[in-house]
Swiss-Prot record:
Name of protein: Homoserine kinase
Chief subcellular location: cytoplasm
Gene this protein is translated from: thrB
Subcellular location: Cytoplasm
Native organism: Haloarcula marismortui (strain ATCC 43049 / DSM 3752 / JCM 8966 / VKM B-1809) (Halobacterium marismortui)
Catalysed reactions, as listed in the record: L-homoserine + ATP = O-phospho-L-homoserine + ADP + H(+)
Function: Catalyzes the ATP-dependent phosphorylation of L-homoserine to L-homoserine phosphate.
A single GO BP: threonine biosynthetic process
Length: 291
């Protein structure tokens, strides 16, 4: 039996819609896999009651099918579904890495990304690499149709998850189909700043690069209290704040010494709106690990 820990992720990061992603030190899914004649799935942990165990409807079932690797698979969810933290991607990433090793398929980590993305498509409806790439490879990733570029970055983060449900499909439906030229110019500049900040481990540049005037404002309307939480986090010292993935998690970049205060402030801001939330004081971390 193999055990794989695959991290939660934050995709988009404001200016990198459907392209940027980072692996988080915490939370994570833990998946145990053992060779078998057919695929069976058992799910426990956060939000497990909402996750189908039918292999045809579960992310890991699709991954097992793509790798022709039947197994008994136990998923312990540390990443809540519909959180904006790459819940389905974490399970798919763990399955891809684990089954690749269990069956000695010989794929590289980068080659496993599109395989895991097929699994995530079972939930989201489309195969996107921006969550599975960092969950498999770790660090900061840039996923395009040409492949994945990865950078080992070290940026402190605060991820605040409110007790609000925002489905990936709903979040995609509100994305604008067009953008003004000035918005695109600003987005390119912000994306360049964020990428440079990741290379330099510079929270200030990363935070500046998280600003977005196209997708984030549209999705913010689905998250009660987003603007208040964002403003409170910035006032507490965050260098940048945006929506993690499809939401509802709100993620902030910061200096190490400000992280605790920002976490407390974000919780309080959601509380003032009558919204319960939990917070992760985390940072950019590594990819899936096999034990």
């Amino acid at each position: 039996m193999l055990t794989v820990r695959a991290p939660a992720t934050s995709a988009n990061l404001g200016s990198g819609f459907d392209v940027f992603g980072v692996a988080l030190e915490r939370p994570a899914d833990v998946v145990r896999l053992e060779k078998a004649d057919r695929v069976t799935i058992d799910v426990t942990g956060a939000g497990s009651q909402y996750i189908p165990e039918d292999p045809d409807k579960n992310t890991v079932g699709a991954v097992a099918d793509a790798l022709d690797a039947p197994a008994r698979i136990q998923i312990d969810k540390g990443v809540r579904p519909a959180s904006g933290l790459g819940s389905s991607a974490a399970s798919a990433a763990a399955a891809a890495v684990g089954l690749n090793e269990l069956y000695d398929r010989g794929y590289s980590r980068e080659e496993l990304v599109p395989i895991a993305a097929k699994g995530e498509a079972v939930v989201s409806g489309d195969a996107h690499d921006d969550n599975v790439a960092p969950s498999i490879m770790g660090g900061f990733t840039i996923a395009t149709d040409k492949g994945v570029t990865q950078v080992d970055a070290d940026i402190p983060l605060v991820a605040c998850l409110p007790d609000i449900v925002v489905s990936t499909r709903d979040a995609r439906n509100v994305v604008p189909e067009t953008a003004r030229v000035d918005q695109m110019v600003e987005t390119v500049g912000n994306a360049a700043s964020l990428t440079t900040g990741m290379h330099r481990d510079d929270p200030e540049l990363v935070g500046q690069g998280m600003h977005d005037t196209v997708v984030t404002p549209a999705r913010a309307k689905l998250i009660d209290g987003y603007e208040q939480v964002r403003e409170a986090a910035l006032a507490a010292g965050a260098t940048g704040v945006t929506i993690s993935g499809a939401g509802p998690t709100v993620i902030a970049a910061c200096a190490e010494e400000d992280r605790r205060q920002i976490a407390s402030t974000m919780l309080d801001a959601f509380g003032e709106r009558g919204v319960d939330a939990r917070v992760y004081q985390t940072r950019i971390g590594g990819g899936a690990e096999v034990f």
